[in-house]
Curated annotation (Swiss-Prot):
Database matches in InterPro entries: Arginosuc_syn_C (IPR048268), Arginosuc_syn_N (IPR048267), Arginosuc_synth (IPR001518), Arginosuc_synth_CS (IPR018223), Arginosuc_synth_type_1_subfam (IPR023434), AS_cat/multimer_dom_body (IPR024074), Rossmann-like_a/b/a_fold (IPR014729)
Known catalytic reactions: L-citrulline + L-aspartate + ATP = 2-(N(omega)-L-arginino)succinate + AMP + diphosphate + H(+)
Complexes and interactors: Homotetramer.
One MF term in the entry's GO annotations: ATP binding
Alphabetical list of CDD domains matching this protein: ASS
Organism name: Corynebacterium glutamicum (strain R)
UniProt protein name: Argininosuccinate synthase
Keyword terms of this UniProt record: Amino-acid biosynthesis, Arginine biosynthesis, ATP-binding, Cytoplasm, Ligase, Nucleotide-binding
Amino acid sequence: MTNRIVLAYSGGLDTTVAIPYLKKMIDGEVIAVSLDLGQGGENLDNVRQRALDAGAAESIVVDAKDEFAEEYCLPTIKANGMYMKQYPLVSAISRPLIVKHLVEAGKQFNGTHVAHGCTGKGNDQVRFEVGFMDTDPNLEIIAPARDFAWTRDKAIAFAEENNVPIEQSVKSPFSIDQNVWGRAIETGYLEDLWNAPTKDIYAYTEDPALGNAPDEVIISFEGGKPVSIDGRPVSVLQAIEELNRRAGAQGVGRLDMVEDRLVGIKSREIYEAPGAIALIKAHEALEDVTIERELARYKRGVDARWAEEVYDGLWFGPLKRSLDAFIDSTQEHVTGDIRMVLHAGSITINGRRSSHSLYDFNLATYDTGDTFDQTLAKGFVQLHGLSSKIANKRDREAGNN
């Protein structure tokens, strides 16, 4: 039986070099699978051809933009998905979708192995391999960059020696991953934490200091899902794309952070996610208006745990599924409009309205028409602080003994 290796193919250095390397090491055919996740940039027909030129027996490009937006970005919006309160899971949410399509290709082509180009230092090896284990444990997993101790310099040298078509060079060694949800840049001079990122590494965002005129936008949601922008109906994909343009033009969505990786190391990452950040901020603001206090407080903890599960590669795990069910149950009333101003790298929320709002003007106002019964407050305060009062009394008495 012929070994058929289904490869997660990005068109970049590691996976392009992996094609001829796997053919030699495993003595089999390579099926390269690439996904269009709205990353833009290079024409994917060129990516497909590069895989064939590198020796792939088949090269498949899947248009998965809408699927990615509806089934992966939307749950992230509902969960306000921010790892370490900053990173909107740009790469992390794309990996389970890639896993899904690789497994499908494995079934189509009678695949015996599945391969990825991740190193042993990153999170993606975990996301891919746990995903394969969860969805098709019969596929044997190969990770050439990790298992055969490839470094980036060695990969470049191998490509040059074997005439493998790549766009990477020793002078520009950044590792870049991008999709419609955002863009991630790492390695190179960024590995020195004191080096500031230069303007040329950014592609999704303009310099916040350019001084563009402020852009006011109204984002409307139904059940936690963005459905219109400035009154125009949009799909989730269209919402992300439009806000990528508009927020990106204002320099919104740039992140420079030191991230706690799953494998135990800290890593410096640069992210651009203008549309993602704008949508999550708008969604959070609408939740503030429409979700009851105790539920909102509890959901914030669930959101943080959800982001950790996704970051850690457990998209298909039972806890993630249960968290999804809880989060979905909270979105029933997250319907309404959020008005925000995008300007100079910042987002300012300046308007909120919802037919499901829990904000009661007559209870909140300090002016005439106030319906809040302040006579109830004194007893409430006494009861609220009673247990703390008793504990502090005990501690004072114990200190006097």
